[in-house]
């Protein structure tokens, strides 16, 4: 969906655009934050932000209104190398870089995995603020408590959508624990 890898089968659209035919247009309109920290660890916080702004032909100043709340928390560390940041600070930097070009849709792949409880809570507060600014946010998460903060949940297994509903509807449909079982044979 982020068009970083182009699909070789099936069909998908983002904002009504085909993920294969329209991938350049989609890339300009989506932000993506991978599950594993993937920014340049040898660059400083400021250098990472400047780099991503340049890639998207924008500037921090131009879209500061979007990242202000997040950036204000990492600005004291702007001269620190990204690899030396704490887990929570790395996530804030990655989110700022994903937002630097003012995307309409934000894809977050397990954004709080391996982050402490306080940072997780802060991160979800930031997402609520971004949602209030009109950004559509898609989050993959293994944490049901995080999923319940979303407007809608999709259960996906092996690339197939099993169910889509509100958190309340999903819990009503699956009142018992869900388990994923796989075997090697």
Task: Tell me what each language-model feature is.
Residues 95:
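Hydrophobic anchor residue at the start of the ABC signature
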Residues 61-84:
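Conserved ABC nucleotide-binding domain
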Residues 10-18, 26:
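Conserved ABC transporter NBD signature motif
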Residues 106-109:
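Catalytic Walker B motif of ABC-type/P-loop ATPase nucleotide-binding domains
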């Amino acid at each position: 969906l982020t068009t970083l890898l182009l699909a070789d089968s099936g069909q998908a659209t983002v904002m009504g655009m085909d993920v294969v035919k329209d991938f350049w247009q989609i890339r300009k309109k989506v932000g993506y934050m991978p599950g594993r920290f993937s920014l340049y660890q040898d660059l400083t916080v400021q250098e990472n932000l400047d780099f991503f702004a340049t890639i998207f032909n924008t500037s921090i100043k131009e879209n500061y209104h979007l990242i202000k709340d997040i950036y204000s928390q990492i600005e004291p560390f702007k001269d620190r190398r990204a690899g030396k940041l704490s887990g929570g600070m790395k996530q804030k930097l990655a989110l700022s870089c994903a937002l630097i070009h003012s995307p309409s849709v934000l894809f977050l792949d397990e954004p709080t995995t391996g982050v402490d409880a306080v940072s997780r809570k802060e991160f979800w507060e930031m997402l609520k603020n971004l949602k209030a600014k009109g950004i559509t946010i898609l989050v993959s998460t293994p944490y049901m408590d995080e999923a319940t903060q979303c407007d809608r949940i999709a259960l996906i297994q092996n690339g197939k959508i099993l169910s889509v509903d509100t958190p309340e509807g999903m819990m009503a449909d699956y009142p018992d624990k869900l388990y994923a079982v796989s075997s090697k044979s």
